[in-house]
Design a protein with these regions (language model features):
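Cytosolic/nucleoplasmic/matrix-facing N-terminal domains/tails
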Residues: 1-146
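Long, low-complexity intrinsically disordered regions
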Residues: 146-153
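Internal signal-anchor transmembrane helix that establishes type II topology
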Residues: 154-168
Length: 168
């Protein structure tokens, strides 16, 4: 399954090109806060597809040759066969790439891409989940800040106090 190999490569490359078809691109997004549901989301990489980037950069073919034990040339031929298959499927229906997303054709024949939402290709954010943050009522904090704080000093034995402080 080529989609599985593309998904693996996306964890380590910001661009994975399928020669003669297009490229999957990653863009880093900072952590974000959604005010409507008080949710902090970790940093992520958003996935997009560019049909115009079709030149073979060798990344996918080299990966396939290493993983499947094929020659580089044989890997390029296998990718070409699969691209032909994908193009035929797209003419009829949508193409679902597991762990990547869904591809379809628009009326002009351009490829549209709908990425899977639950996959974060940013390794630094591995296992981080969105965090719900409750709103803090500032008026309650202001009330407690105005309360005086009293300290009592033991005047009877100041030497013990200094010994205690010096022990730290």
């Amino acid at each position: 399954d080529l989609a599985k190999h593309i998904g693996e490569l996306l964890y380590f490359n910001d661009c994975v090109t399928i020669p003669g078809f297009g490229s999957f691109l990653l863009e880093k997004k900072d952590a974000s806060y959604n005010e409507s549901n008080n949710l902090y989301s970790p940093p992520t990489k958003s996935l997009s597809f560019n049909q115009k980037l079709q030149s073979n950069d060798g990344v996918l073919a080299l990966h396939l040759s290493k993983v499947l034990g094929l020659s580089y040339e044989k890997s390029v031929i296998e990718i070409h066969k699969l691209v032909m298959n994908w193009n035929e499927k797209l003419k009829i229906s949508k193409l679902n790439l597991s762990k990547i997303g869904e591809l379809s054709l628009n009326d002009e024949g351009a490829i549209l891409f709908n990425p899977k939402k639950n996959i974060n290709y940013l390794i630094d954010s591995y296992a981080l989940k969105p965090v719900n943050a409750e709103l803090i009522n500032r008026s309650d904090l202001e009330k407690t800040e105005n309360m005086p704080v009293y300290f009592t000093v033991n005047k009877n034995n100041p030497v013990k106090l200094f010994r205690y402080a010096a022990s730290f």
